[in-house]
Amino acid sequence: MTRHQMREAAFLLTFEQSFSNDSVDEIVSVAKECELFEIDDAAVKLFRGIVENRDSIDTIIQKHLKNWTIDRISKVSLAVLRVAIYEMRFCDEVSDDIAISEAVILAQTYTLKDDVNFVNGVLASVNKDQ
């Protein structure tokens, strides 16, 4: 599994979690049973880190929204932002530029065009604030 595929799996798990209060293990188990996408240990580790740090991640997101609240962000864009910000702030092995680039690719794949610009803008603001 490539790093991009691992990131995409973590994004899909993060998106799924936005619809339930299930635990990380329950969400991963159901996703593996459905076999809609590949999930490896690295993807689960990334997803678990996102879930464990979600409040901090969401605080960072909210801080960088202009005239928005986090509740207005689409669930897809929010999942992309959570993955990227987790990697930017909590993973030393991933550079911010790579996290942002990968987030934009995920946004291009899964969101509307306007959301791609929104995601990129929020992440650029987070990156500048370090």
Regions found by a protein language model. Give the residues of each.
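N-terminal interaction/assembly modules
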Residues: 1-130
